């Protein structure tokens, strides 16, 4: 009997020491610890959530429909190039998720089957129609979200944000948490920019240039496009270049007619960095393509000498220089009315790679560091006040047994904080609410046991026998209530978002630790007091 009690005391002491070791990195004392301690023992501790230390919580939605269309467009481009190399010059057009090839040719069908086994081929109205099966599109959707996560992660890494959290949510949503970010607006612009870099030829042969206005006001692009849609050849489209009046600051858009066919994309970029034009002292973005991109760029510039090549990023034309000669080495540049910061941001998104499809911001919650600090203080105060009032009530109502319950309460808080630190859990404001709830539940368990003990004492049992019977009878009631709470917490964790998950984690840990402190902690104290002694009364 005595040996069993001492073993339980040793177990409690061990768990307390372990909890303190794990929580130590979150205290000022950690800075005084020797080097060997920091190297060999836990050094991370509890991570504060965005609502406590400030930062941005962003949710992006990947445009999966556009991802499907982009995939088909790329296949169409590749087929066009492939067929031309084979000496065939069919018309290849992409409409939505279908590729139309004219004329119908058995050699063309054979080349398609050899290179794209997934494509289903049919004939209709003098066209070869190519389509991807739904299974292939599902792979495209999954891959697009995964690639978008990687691209966003690369961009955030270049921003230098410490401990960002990025993960998939649902089918096509990406959750991005940026703790302590100083410029949320800039971060949002860099993360959300699609960075689809495209090189297209200007259509210099069309007579529509004479009717085209030199400038339109910014914001009138949609109206302008609707007016011109019916006038354009099927193979052309209009893109705009941003023009800023340096004197007034007014923004205008200059329309250009370009070919829809994409000659080269930013997928083949190897490097992008900011350079300064020595003649005009203006920044520009210098590009270098990889070997495959350099070869394509060389072919383009060799084939279209004296033609204007439009450099388009996310649908906006940046420049349209005249190709003077074949360019070898795969070097190009994007110039425009950049500030140095704008050029740097553009280089970042190009270096990190293009998003596989456009992303749309559907939620943006930004918490300032001051508000986060206030939340921590308010949360601390709530837990402290709750603990004090609960402790006083227990002492007044249950006397010495109330003191034992308060010991269990302190033990519960120490072990809970230690467990959170051991898991490197992210503590949010709802998480603090979970701690406060765990405090209430810890006391609730003791109340159940103490009332059972009182009932046994009224039946005439000795204090020692009343304690034993009271604990046995209360055990299953306490156990059942805690298991049902754990089930609820598990559901919250599975279906909830970040803050709700934080609440679920602290609640789950609190429930598990509460079982330990209530059924082992307080029982050990009672056994220690009454070991080898038969007291006639019990302060309860």
From Swiss-Prot:
The keyword Transmembrane helix applies. It holds the Pfam family SecD_1st. Gene3D superfamilies: 3.30.1360.200, 3.30.70.3400, Multidrug efflux transporter AcrB transmembrane domain. One of its GO terms (molecular function) is protein-transporting ATPase activity. Keywords: Cell inner membrane, Cell membrane, Membrane, Protein transport, Translocation, Transmembrane, Transmembrane helix, Transport. One of its GO terms (cellular component) is plasma membrane. GO terms for biological process: intracellular protein transmembrane transport; protein targeting; protein transport; protein transport by the Sec complex. It is found in: Cell inner membrane. InterPro entries: Acrflvin-R, SecD, SecD/SecF_arch_bac, SecD/SecF_CS, SecD_1st, SecD_SecF_C, SecD_SecF_C_bact, SecDF_P1_head. The chain crosses the membrane at residues 4-24, 376-396, 403-423, 430-450, 475-495, 502-522. It is a multi-pass membrane protein. The keyword Cell inner membrane applies. NCBIfam families: 2A0604s01, secD. Part of the Sec protein translocase complex. Interacts with the SecYEG preprotein conducting channel. SecDF uses the proton motive force (PMF) to complete protein translocation after the ATP-dependent function of SecA. Belongs to the SecD/SecF family. SecD subfamily. Forms a complex with SecF. Part of the essential Sec protein translocation apparatus which comprises SecA, SecYEG and auxiliary proteins SecDF. Other proteins may also be involved. This is Protein translocase subunit SecD. It comes from Thermodesulfovibrio yellowstonii (strain ATCC 51303 / DSM 11347 / YP87).
């Amino acid at each position: 009997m005595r040996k069993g009690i001492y073993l339980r005391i040793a177990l409690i002491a061990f768990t307390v020491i372990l909890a303190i070791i794990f929580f130590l990195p979150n205290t000022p004392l950690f800075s005084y610890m020797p080097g060997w301690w920091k190297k060999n023992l836990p050094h991370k501790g509890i991570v504060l959530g965005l609502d406590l230390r400030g930062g941005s919580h962003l949710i992006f939605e990947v445009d999966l429909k556009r991802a499907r269309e982009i995939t088909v467009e790329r296949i169409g481009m590749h087929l066009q190039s492939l067929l031309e190399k084979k000496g065939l010059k069919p018309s290849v057009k992409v409409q939505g998720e279908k590729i139309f090839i004219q004329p119908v040719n058995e050699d063309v069908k054979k080349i398609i089957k050899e290179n794209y086994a997934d494509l289903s081929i049919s004939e209709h109205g003098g066209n070869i129609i190519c389509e991807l099966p739904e299974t292939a599109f599902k792979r495209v959707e999954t891959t697009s979200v995964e690639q978008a996560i990687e691209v966003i992660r690369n961009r955030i890494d270049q921003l230098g944000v410490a401990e960002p959290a990025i993960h998939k949510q649902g089918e096509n949503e990406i959750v991005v948490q940026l703790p302590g970010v100083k410029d949320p607006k800039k971060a949002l612009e860099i993360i959300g920019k699609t960075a689809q870099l495209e090189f297209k030829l200007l259509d210099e042969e069309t007579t529509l240039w004479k009717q085209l206005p030199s400038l339109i006001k910014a914001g009138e692009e949609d109206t302008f496009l609707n007016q011109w849609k019916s006038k354009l050849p099927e193979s052309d489209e209009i893109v705009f270049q941003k023009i800023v009046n340096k004197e007034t600051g007014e923004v205008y858009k200059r329309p250009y007619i370009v070919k829809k066919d994409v000659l080269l994309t930013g997928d083949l970029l190897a490097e992008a960095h900011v350079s300064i034009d020595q003649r005009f002292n203006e920044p520009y973005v210098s590009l270098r393509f990889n070997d495959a991109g350099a070869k394509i760029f060389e072919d383009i510039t060799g084939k279209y000498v004296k033609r204007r090549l439009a450099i388009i990023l996310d649908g906006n034309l940046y420049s349209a220089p005249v190709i003077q000669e074949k360019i070898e080495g795969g070097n190009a540049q994007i110039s425009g009315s950049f500030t140095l910061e704008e050029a740097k941001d553009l280089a970042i998104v190009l270096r990190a790679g293009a998003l596989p499809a456009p992303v749309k911001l559907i939620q943006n919650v930004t918490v300032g560091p001051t508000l986060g600090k206030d939340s921590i203080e308010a949360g601390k105060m709530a837990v402290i006040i709750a603990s004090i009032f609960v402790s006083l009530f227990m002492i007044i109502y249950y006397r010495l047994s109330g003191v034992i319950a308060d010991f269990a309460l302190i033990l519960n808080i120490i072990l809970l904080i230690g467990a959170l630190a051991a898991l490197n859990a992210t503590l949010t404001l709802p998480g603090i609410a979970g701690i406060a709830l765990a405090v209430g539940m810890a006391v609730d368990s003791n109340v159940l046991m103490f009332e059972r003990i009182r009932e046994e004492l009224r039946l005439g049992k000795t204090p020692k026998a009343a304690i034993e019977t009271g604990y046995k009878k209360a055990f299953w009631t306490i156990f059942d209530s805690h298991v049902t709470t754990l089930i609820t917490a598990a559901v919250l964790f599975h279906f909830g978002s970040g803050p709700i998950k934080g609440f679920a984690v602290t609640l789950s840990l609190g429930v598990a630790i509460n079982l330990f402190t209530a059924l082992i902690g307080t029982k050990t104290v009672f056994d220690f007091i009454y070991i080898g002694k038969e007291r006639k009364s019990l302060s309860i």
